[in-house]
């Protein structure tokens, strides 16, 4: 990335971050789905293979990241912090965990961009693997358990690869087997206040959120209630991550009154800082 390009940040951009049919017994190989879906994000002039098992292409196609997420200063800091972190990563994958709507996909794409990694969204890979166009439809046609089984298959196959940033589904942390896969790389928890998540989800709708779409009533109230219940179930699991990125902490550091004015690049910078701290401490212990 050219850190010298004048790029303007979008206040509050984090709040808009994004996030086909088969039988329950016949399984489409996950490796095939990943290979077909691969859209690598690669920067730099001397990148090594992304790994062989899933055959992810490392072609230098444009990353397609909306550069308006960066200011020139943020772009420079991202570049510098990525250079600091890369030697400690040793090509290991990075897995982003956190509640639905926490910005894992957009922050993950930024991290992949500056690290020269490829990016994957595990939910999208499950959709490709089972041939169903959305997680909500998978839940409707099959079950949550069916989705979780395929999610574990995706994470298992990704764990054999290198140089990937993976945005996981909000519930991926509940299965211990998934942690055994993710711990082959490094894990980052994006910790977003539930109130901010509920407001964001209520604004965009719950149709794509199968765990939130059943109840009727005020969108914010039902989103907040369900998110609170889910977080209580998952909190200890999220805490297993190697690094925690607290958006409240970033907001305080930057003098924001709330997290909705943070840019995705500011969150990505904090993720790199936390990852560098964890990896350097780990290296010191080993030595």
UniProtKB/Swiss-Prot annotation:
Transit peptide: 1-57
Tissue: Expressed in panicles.
Pfam families: SKI
Cofactor note: Binds 1 Mg(2+) ion per subunit.
Pathway: Metabolic intermediate biosynthesis; chorismate biosynthesis; chorismate from D-erythrose 4-phosphate and phosphoenolpyruvate: step 5/7
Top-level taxon: Eukaryota
Gene3D superfamilies found in the cross-reference section: P-loop containing nucleotide triphosphate hydrolases
Keywords for the protein's UniProt record, in alphabetical order: Amino-acid biosynthesis, Aromatic amino acid biosynthesis, ATP-binding, Chloroplast, Kinase, Magnesium, Metal-binding, Nucleotide-binding, Plastid, Transferase, Transit peptide
Annotated residues for binding of substrate: 123, 148, 170
UniProt: ATP binding residues: 98-105, 209
Binding-site residues for Mg(2+), renumbered to this chain: 105
Annotated function: Catalyzes the specific phosphorylation of the 3-hydroxyl group of shikimic acid using ATP as a cosubstrate.
Protein name stated in the entry: Shikimate kinase 3, chloroplastic
Source organism per UniProt: Oryza sativa subsp. japonica
Gene: SK3
